[in-house]
From Swiss-Prot:
Tissue expression as described in the entry: Expressed in roots, rosette and cauline leaves, stems, flowers and siliques.
Native organism taxonomy: Eukaryota, Viridiplantae, Streptophyta, Embryophyta, Tracheophyta
Entry-linked Pfam families: BD-FAE
Name the UniProt record assigns to this protein: Probable isoprenylcysteine alpha-carbonyl methylesterase ICMEL1
Annotated substrate binding sites: G214, G215, A216, Q285, S286, A287
Keywords tagged on the record: Endoplasmic reticulum, Golgi apparatus, Hydrolase, Membrane, Transmembrane, Transmembrane helix
Enzyme Commission number, as recorded: 3.1.1.n2
Organism: Arabidopsis thaliana
């Protein structure tokens, strides 16, 4: 039965004022046939204070606001960018890699692959272990013994224990599947590596999702995206999970630089692995959503001629998917402090209080001097759970409203009762139908109804009672 769309209007905006489209999705055990759609008018004032740009660049894109209907899942939103003019960019600043080997998309050998050998990977793992141990000791000196941090750490242990059956199965897939290409080098900095998750079916170029993992800017790692990579690859989508330097190994500018280098590698080399360079989607989760948003905004500023030379084009990004992200750091500092990510640590990560505006995409796009970059931004689709206490869902709503008010394409989908980790971990481990997963697949596959309708048996990885307990003890 098609979803029922209920229009709820708090107050009608002027006809000349764009509105942000927001969808509320019910819990999986609620009535899935009911979807509430509300439009929010423009009550905000443009921030006139100068905002230092992240970095820069752009791509011409014009269109009207998306309209959602009960039948839009097959391609309503995809119409936003299907006719976008894509530019190819052969410029590649990452042409030399010292520890490359060969391999193919289907697990064989090919001269185009840059995957390390087992011996190199063991050596790399040992070096990384030593490095991360030293960094953890340094990190502990920042954290001290704050009671909030200690309680979160204990809750994290319980949470990981409850989901361990799923982690073991995903870990086995990650290390032993011939369709996972681990630790492909994309740059010359520490942790400049990415993992590729390849479909079993190698016919035809595949759409690609470049994924930036979360981890509070401190504990992010490329393997955190292995469950997403496995499940999307089962739907004939290539996933590139990009690793990056965490704090204190690097600060936010290093993270954005690494993410940009990883995206550049994907844009310039994904065809060697069976990917379609004209169908690339950028996705981030939690801190990764913030880093990815900073990266794409920085890129369009660069492209507009206000930054350094570029090695990839924002026009290659068909859409941005932001999962449970925060985009206005000024509004989140106190909240993070109350949750155990203390102000002193957070400001160190973000390179000082004076840099918070520079690394807040929601504020950067409102800079009056950067109005010309809006048309170059890809469509933004933001996903958030209404019971997310790590980063409140208002963060996504506010960013979407700001983008839409400025003329960019933006949509926020809220999932009723979902927490910070439900959408990314518990729901995928539950098996069966996953609303957010299907929402992503529908956009990525576009009008390919055959691929969208492909039946994939998503098996349960963790017993239901353990998932429910994990929901309650999650420190995120």
């Amino acid at each position: 039965m098609p979803s029922q769309i209920l229009q709820i209007s708090h107050h009608l905006p002027p006809k000349s004022s764009p509105s942000t489209e927001m969808m509320f999705k019910s819990l999986i055990y609620d009535d899935p046939s009911t979807t509430l759609l509300s439009r929010f008018g423009d009550d905000h004032h443009t921030i006139s204070s100068t905002v230092k740009p992240l970095l820069s660049r752009s791509s011409s894109y014009n269109g009207t606001a998306m309209k959602t209907s009960s039948s839009s899942s097959a391609g309503g939103f995809t119409g936003w960018y299907q006719n976008r003019r894509r530019r190819s960019n052969s410029d590649n600043c990452l042409s030399a890699f010292s520890d490359d080997t060969n391999g193919t998309a289907d697990g064989g050998n090919n001269s185009g692959d840059r995957q390390t050998t087992i011996g190199q990977e063991v050596g790399h793992a040992a070096a990384e272990t030593f490095l991360l141990t030293r960094l953890c000791l340094k990190l502990l000196s920042y954290l001290g013994v704050g009671y909030r941090w200690i309680t979160r750490f204990m809750a994290l242990g319980c949470y990981a224990f409850l989901l361990m059956p799923g982690f073991i199965q995903v870990g086995y897939y990650y290390f032993f599947s011939p369709y996972v290409r681990r630790s492909i080098v994309y740059g010359d900095q520490p942790r400049n590596r990415l993992d590729l998750y390849l479909p079993k079916n190698s016919t035809g170029p595949k759409p690609v999702v470049a994924f930036v993992t979360g981890g509070a800017w401190i504990i992010g790692y490329k393997a955190w995206g292995s469950l997403l990579g496995q499940q999307l690859s089962e739907r004939d989508i290539i996933v590139a999970c990009i690793d990056y330097r965490n704090f204190p190994q690097g600060s936010i500018s290093d993270m954005v630089k690494d993410a940009s280098s990883g995206i550049s590698f994907v844009c310039n080399h994904i065809a060697e692995y069976g990917g379609d360079p004209d169908r690339i989607y950028l996705m981030g989760q939690s801190a990764g959503a913030h880093i990815a948003a900073c990266t794409i905004v920085e890129q369009v500023i660069k492209e507009s001629g206000e930054g350094d030379s570029v090695s990839w084009s924002s026009s290659q990004i068909n859409a941005y998917f932001g999962l449970s992200g925060g985009y206005n750091l000024l509004n989140l500092v106190d909240h993070f402090h109350s949750r155990g990510l203390y102000r002193s640590i957070f400001l160190s990560i973000m390179e000082g209080e004076e840099s918070l505006r520079q690394f807040s995409p929601e504020l950067v796009v409102q800079n009056p001097n950067l109005k010309h970059i809006i048309a170059r931004l890809p469509p933004f689709i933001l996903f958030h759970g209404t019971d997310d206490y790590s980063i409140p869902s208002d963060a996504s709503k506010s960013f979407a409203e700001t983008l839409q008010r400025l003329g960019a394409k933006a949509k926020v989908i809220l999932y009723e009762g979902k927490t910070h980790t439900d959408l990314f971990l518990q729901d995928p481990m539950r098996g069966g139908i996953d609303e957010m997963f299907e929402d992503i697949v529908t956009v990525v596959l576009g009008d390919d109804q055959e691929a969208i309708g492909k039946s994939v048996d998503r098996r349960r990885l963790v017993p239901e009672f353990m998932l429910k307990l994990a929901h309650w003890v999650s420190p995120f």
